[in-house]
C-alpha cells in the first residue's frame, strides 16, 4: 500500500490547468517521498522483529523504539497545526493517494487489533508505535487533502442525511 501511495502522490500534476505551477503539490510529494519512504523501512524493521521469537532477536538488529514513536507524534503535531479541528467523523474517500492512505490506516488499525492478542509476547513500544502509526496516517491524509484543495467527506448521522438514492432518483424523474 505504501508503494501505491508514493506512486499516486507522484501522479499529482505539478501544474494548474492554466499552466501555472502548484507549489503546494511539490511540498506534498516531498513529504510523501521522505516520510513514506522512511515508514517503509520502519515497517520492515518491525516485521523482522515480529517474525522472530522474542528470545531469538539478533543482538545486532535495530528495533523500533520510543524515538520512532515520538517522531510520528512530532510529525502529526506539525501537520495538525494547519488543520481545522474535527467536527465529525471523516469518511474514507478522495483521489489516488488520499484513498490509499485511508486504506493503509484501516489495515494498520486491523494490525493493531490483532497485536493486542499477542501483547504479552511483544515489547510495549511496538504496540504503541502501531497505534501512533494509524493516527499518523489519518493526520497525513487530512493534511494532504487540505494541501491539494480537496474536500473531506464528513459522516452525516442518520436523521440529518438527505433523501435516499431511490428518493433522489424519483425526484430527478419528476423534474424531467
Predicted regions and their residues:
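Phosphate/pyrophosphate-binding loop motifs in nucleotide- or prenyl diphosphate-using proteins
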Residues: 1-176
Amino acid at each position: 500500500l505504501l508503494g501505491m501511495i508514493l506512486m499516486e502522490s507522484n501522479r499529482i500534476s505539478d501544474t494548474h490547468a492554466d499552466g501555472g505551477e502548484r507549489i503546494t503539490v511539490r511540498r506534498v510529494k516531498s513529504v510523501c517521498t521522505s516520510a513514506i519512504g522512511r515508514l517503509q523501512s520502519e515497517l520492515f524493521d518491525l516485521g523482522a522483529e515480529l517474525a522472530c521469537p522474542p528470545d531469538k532477536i539478533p543482538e545486532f538488529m535495530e528495533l523500533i523504539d520510543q524515538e520512532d514513536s515520538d517522531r510520528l507524534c512530532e510529525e502529526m503535531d506539525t501537520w495538525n497545526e494547519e488543520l481545522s479541528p474535527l467536527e465529525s467523523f471523516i469518511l474514507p474517500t478522495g483521489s489516488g493517494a488520499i484513498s490509499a492512505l485511508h486504506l493503509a490506516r484501516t489495515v494498520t488499525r486491523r494490525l493493531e487489533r490483532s497485536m493486542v492478542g499477542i501483547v504479552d509476547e511483544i515489547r510495549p513500544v511496538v504496540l504503541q508505535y502501531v497505534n501512533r502509526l494509524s493516527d499518523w496516517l489519518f493526520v497525513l491524509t487530512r493534511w494532504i487533502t487540505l494541501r491539494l484543495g480537496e474536500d473531506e467527506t464528513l459522516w452525516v448521522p442518520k436523521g440529518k442525511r438527505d433523501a435516499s438514492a431511490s428518493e433522489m432518483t424519483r425526484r430527478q424523474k419528476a423534474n424531467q
